[in-house]
C-alpha cells in the first residue's frame, strides 16, 4: 500500500506549558503522528510503561492467574459434568470481568501518579 502524501499543513498555537504537556503525553513518539492519531480516533500504541504495583499485589494477581489457568484446564479436560462446567465457566467469566475492572483501575491510578 502506497502511503498517502500529506499536502496540507495544520498550524496551532500553544503555550510553553501546553507544548510540554503534549510532548509528555505522546511518550516519545513523533508529536505530529501522535496528534493525528488521537484527533482522528485511530489507535495509539501504548508505550508499554505500566504503573508500579506493590509486590504483594503482584503476587496475588499472579496466583489468581495461575488458579484460573488450572481451573480452565480442568474444565477443558472433560472430567466434570456439563452442569458443573457451565457453573465454573460462569464463575470464570465473572472473575475475568473483575480482573478487567481491576486492570483499568490500576492503569487509571498509574496515569494519576504520572501526572
From Swiss-Prot:
Molecular function (GO) terms for this protein are: DNA binding
Q: What does the record note on quaternary structure?
A: Homodimer. Interacts with MbeA and MbeB to form the relaxosome.
The top of its lineage is: Bacteria, Pseudomonadati, Pseudomonadota, Gammaproteobacteria, Enterobacterales
Gene coding for it: mbeC
Superkingdom of this entry's organism? Bacteria
> How does the entry describe the domains?
Consists of two domains: the N-terminal domain, which contains a predicted ribbon-helix-helix (RHH) DNA-binding domain, and the C-terminal domain, which comprises a signature shared by nicking accessory proteins.
The keyword Transport appears for this protein: no
Role noted for this protein:
Required for efficient mobilization of ColE1 plasmid and is thus essential to promote the specific transfer of the plasmid during conjugation. Probably functions by inducing DNA bending, helping the MbeA relaxase to melt the DNA around the nic site and cleave the phosphodiester bond. Binds specifically double-stranded DNA (dsDNA) containing the ColE1 oriT but does not recognize the inverted repeat (IR).
Keywords (A to Z) from UniProt: Conjugation, DNA-binding, Mobility protein, Plasmid
* Name under which the protein is recorded: Mobilization protein MbeC
InterPro entries membership: MobC
Q: What is the effect of changing residue 13 to A?
A: Unable to bind either single- or double-stranded DNA. Reduces ColE1 mobilization by 3000-fold
Q: Name one Pfam family in it.
A: MobC
Q: Which organism is it from?
A: Escherichia coli
Q: Its family?
A: To E.coli MbaC and MbkC.
